[in-house]
Every structure is written in C-alpha cells, then in structure tokens.
Amino acid sequence: LGLPVLCTSFAEAKAALGYSDDFANYDLCEVMYTHFQLFGCQPVILCNMLNPATMKATVTAADINLTDHKALLPIDAINDASLVVKPSTSGSALTKGTDYEAYYSGENLVVEAIEGGSAYSAAKLNIAYNKVDTSKVTKTVVAGGFAAVDSCMSTVGIVPDLLLAPKYSSESEVAAVMATKAGGINGMFGAKALVDLDTATANSYTAAVSTKADKG
C-alpha cells in the first residue's frame, strides 16, 4: 500500500494489484487496461492507495442461491475473517476448508461448497461479508500517494516522466500536488503532470481553458 510497483505487462499488473473491469471504482485497473491493452505501452509504475483492511463496509447476511455448488459474490467482497457462511439464518457458521472454499474468479468472489462437507447438497447459503468501499479513497488520500514518487528511483530503479491520477486529478488539491511533484523529483529530475478536466463543465475548448485557469 502506497509503494511504487513497476509493471511491464498487463498480466504482471493484474498479478501484482488485482483487476476488475469496474473502472468507475477501480481507477488503477483503467490505467492498466489503457496502458497495456489499448496502447501497448510499457512500463508503468502503479501506486495503490486502496486499503481493504480499513476502507470497507459491512454487507448484511443474505441467502444466496448456489449453482453447481457455487455462490457468486461481487468482486468487491473481501475474503477474510468477516466472511461468514451458514446453511441458514439461524444455523451455525460453516467451516472454511472443510465445508466450503472461497476464491476470486473473474469478477466474483466464489464461495464453493466442498464435496463431503455439510453444505454440499445445499441449494442456498446464508452469507455475510465485508466489501471494499472505494468511496473512502478520497482526494486527500490520493494526493498523499504522490509522496511515493521520490522513492521510485530507489525502489524500482526508474524515475517517472508522466504523473497521472485518473478522475482525482480534476480536483484542484490533487492537481496542485501533482504539479509540485512534477517540478522536482529527488531534487534533480522533472516530469509532466497529466491533469484531468471535468467534462461536465469543460465541455468545449473555451470552457476547457477557463476550467484549467480556475483549477490553477
């Protein structure tokens, strides 16, 4: 968390940080896809500021139907001690590794009943869990992440020449930190800050210029 991660391929980036097509909530995944899949560029240095240990929300227990002995939870479900699986609302919690396994596959956290376990013949399971709350990644958190720029040389051996913070850089506070950091990395290198403009207001060339001026 908050450390530079050097990636030279789409597969490497996914293995290092995980991946989802939900770009509205997972901005680094959008960078991965755009950088490697759309434009075929490499490398890229990614810095994750989403901490699922603290940036989470509770999902109330609910019955979920099983298909092929599997219950599919959304990708933002967290596979940790908060995952409680029961045969019913009033039943006792099942044992992970004996009655079920939980693992990520595609865009889901899969809860699969184990053959020989007490839930293998169940048609549904009652499941409670915590989920990632991406709304807790605030502009302040993202701005703070740019402190990692100065450690890129010592940790990954490369100094970035372009700084990005998709969506967040449209906030003046984040853009200001990016501009300052781009002006002097490790006291000797320079970079360019690629800052987003909110197209809700910057919807023409003229508006883009005025919005840029307003944001500083």
Name each model-derived stretch.
Residues 1-216:
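Surface-exposed assembly/interface segments
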